[in-house]
From Swiss-Prot:
Entry comment describing in which tissues the protein is expressed: Expressed by the venom gland.
Prosequence residues removed at maturation: 85-90
Keyword Secreted: yes
Name under which the protein is recorded: Kunitz-type serine protease inhibitor B5
Gene3D superfamilies (UniProt xref): Pancreatic trypsin inhibitor Kunitz domain
Subcellular location(s) of the protein: Secreted
Signal peptide: 1-24
Length: 90
């Protein structure tokens, strides 16, 4: 296969990987942790994945400790844990 063909194949595989929905079985385990504001008092707007409602929800993060189920934006939460705007897995 030519190098152009290999590049095209690599590009298509990359695009497919980006667009393939994340199923519930593929979510990182930390997506199932509860929201944890931590112990500090920084009052940072953050988002966590709520596995019961299948939505990314806002919470206030204190800035230290907590757990891995926290994201700086709703979009990053959706990308990582697979929640959609309507709360269904994407």
């Amino acid at each position: 296969m030519s190098s152009g063909g290999l590049l095209l194949l690599l590009g298509l595989l990359t695009l497919w990987a980006e667009l393939t929905p994340i199923s519930g079985h593929d979510r990182p385990k930390f997506c199932y942790l509860p929201a944890d504001p931590g112990e500090c008092l920084a009052h940072m707007r953050s988002f966590y994945y709520d596995s019961e409602s299948k939505k990314c929800k806002e919470f206030i993060y204190g800035g230290c400790h907590g757990n891995a189920n926290k994201f700086p934006s709703r979009d990053k939460c959706r990308q990582t844990c697979g929640a959609s705007a309507k709360g269904r897995p994407t």
